[in-house]
Amino acid sequence: MKIFATIIIFLAGIYGSLSAQTLHGTVVTSDGEAVRLANVAILNPTDSTYIAGTITHDNGTFSIAADSKNLIKVWCTGFMPYLGKVANANMRIVLSPDTIMLGEVEVKAAKPLSRIEGDAIVTNIRGTILQNIGTAKDVLGYLPGIISVQGGIEVLGKGAPTFYINGRKMRSYTELDMLKSNKIKKVELVTNPGARYDSSVNAVIRISADRDPGEGFAIDNTARLGYRDFVYGGDDLSLNYRTGKLDVFSNLKYGYNKSKGHSTNVQNSWLQSSYRQEIGLESEGKSQIYDAQLGADYTISNTSSTGVYYKLTCQPSDKNNVYTGNIYIDNILNESSLIDQGSNTHLTSHTVDGYYTAIFGKWTFDAAFDLLWKYSDDDILSNELINNTDKLRLNTESNVDSRMFAAEAHASHPWLKGNFSFGAEYIDSRRNDDFFNPEHLLNDNQLVLDERNAGIYAQTAQRLGKVTLQLGLRYEHIESRYHEFGKFIPEQSKTYNKVLPSVTLVLPIGKNMLQLSYSRKYKRPLYSQLSSSIYYVNRYLYQSGNPLLKSEYSHNISANYRFGQFMIMANYGLTDDKIISEISQYGDNSNITLLRKENSTHDLHELQAFVTYMPQFGNYFSVLTAGIMAQFYKIDYCGNIRNMNNPIGMVQWKNIVALPRNLKLEASLTWRTCGEAENIDMGHTWSINAGITKVFNRHWQAKISVNDIFNTARKSYNTIYSDYRDIYLEKYVNTRGVECSVRYMFNTTKSKYKGKGAGNNEKPRL
């Protein structure tokens, strides 16, 4: 706590030295959206020579010494520059976009404009061909540095990002489906997040969307129906009622999915004898999701608001697996088996989120809290027949009960030629993990993991001539306490104290922009990865956590360069104690393989480089991304060192054609070569998708899409190497499907809810 006190005193000293400013102002767009990191210059009225300058901070405000006779010039990429006289009172400066809009007529041929701005790659969506493409998820797949992967979104070379919508942390991917593209103003991609974000965050996507209050009742409903082996579908319903300063909102979602597949698993072990296990799997399962959210937002004044919401999510699922297995010892058949396994899983979560945001003079302040309760139970029943004679019946039950409280607060203030911000975050979480096996073939377990996480940060962004420099420092203190059957286990309990710096530099090169950044990160294991419970996958494969896992640490250097219609992105990372999948023998039984996580004994070096080309020809818009992901890594395998250095190539080509009668045609190609990632050798894959969208009027929209037209992505295969074993997995799942969606809108605007949430990176760990 002495470090906390020292930093707080340091921050107070800085702000005690802030001098008063003569001119205060706010820079906004024509939609009222704050313009961050806009250039502000005070000019001599006689010859327009430069006198002083600064940049706006996150809420668009600025302060600068100026005389009433001076001129003020404000400009930012993507907007028309502003030039006028200095006002004596607070100034409100409105920047007009350089995309031409004629009344209610959409400029459908306008190209999304991507630019480097501060710590982010910013892409305007409003007024472009992407405006009516569908949902936020559809939009993101067309942006530089972002790809669509199996229904999710990833940042190239960074994995799954953390999402913010109007400053509020996104809780699940369903929110991307519920946010429609015509509500999005711009998207910001941060490829190397600074001190403001949790140290485990590798990339951030910030989405700015409409939040005009409007009046009265509004409805936005999208129904989906598709076929992929089986019929699947769902419905998303958003309701709003707005009156005066009050906004009451509700979101309801239902989804149903059913799927099947088969796979082949070959396990090789080289011990005193050579073991080979060949396992076939036929699986079929169904899942549902029920999601309900109710909340309210109240605008206290033009500069402050508060809100709260409650969310309930239920996800039941059932699955049936049939395994056929053969075990060979020194190439002689030793055992055959047939396993019929059924599983039933229920997951329920309750979330309460609240926020408060305000501007006091030159200060911007926001605070948030989160309460999360999460329950899951997983029951598995296996009936096994060994060598056509021996029968075995096995039941397992796993119950996980998690809860979390989190709170955070942030403040920012103009300082020198930029701004200064600082904040604090506190998280208190607990996970109870109980595992039972009535037949006592596996050990029962009762685990409790308590964790306290406190963090503070300070960050400043300054304009140094034409260069923007952002410096940040974050300190985190974490205490983790591990209990098994009510007994405290000190060797599995950990305490961390970490100081994590970050630097971002943005500078022009001619008419182009270059962004360079460095950050130090660390990633804690998931709670499930720290569990010592043994989970029964099948007769030959068990899975468990590892309570001795350490956090992994990494150094990241990123470079982004934009010129013309091209965006070049590169990243280098060095990771210590990388958490990887390891396979080993379970106890004294060489027929059973245990899969769990371990810290690698070798450092992992990773290099990624991508080029995105975004041309437009009339009503045709295309995004072509090509790149390579390479690693320099080695593992211990069969008593030798195996190099895992084969790079992976990737190409994604997305196309949109705007047709007459409000039609849009889409087509995309995704291709990935074989290569190696960590200790896994991955196979190649490719697919082609297509779709057509029709807007009937301002209330109705329909879309038909076909995923993986040639069903080429149905096969996936990879090999895991570890110690004296390897596992080859070949999986077939039908990825070809057709889907139709219909959307109805009435008096729709985005909810005004501005909460960011707290403990956002602790939730997925639970």
What residues fall within each predicted segment?
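Short, acidic Ser/Thr/Gly-rich low-complexity loop/linker segments typical of extracellular
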Residues: T46-T61
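Short acidic/polar hinge/loop motifs at secondary-structure boundaries
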Residues: Y142, R168-G194
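Surface-exposed extracellular loop regions of Gram-negative outer-membrane beta-barrel proteins
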Residues: S208-A223, H262, V266, Y290-A292, ...
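Face-selective signature of the C-terminal outer-membrane beta-barrel domain
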Residues: D291-S317, I339-E484, P508, N512-M513, ...
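Outer membrane beta-barrel strand-and-loop segments of large Gram-negative receptors
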Residues: M404-E408, N453-I456, S544, K550, ...
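Outer-membrane beta-barrel signature, preferentially recognizing the C-terminal barrel domain
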Residues: V448-E451, E491-K494, Y522-D576, L595-L607, ...
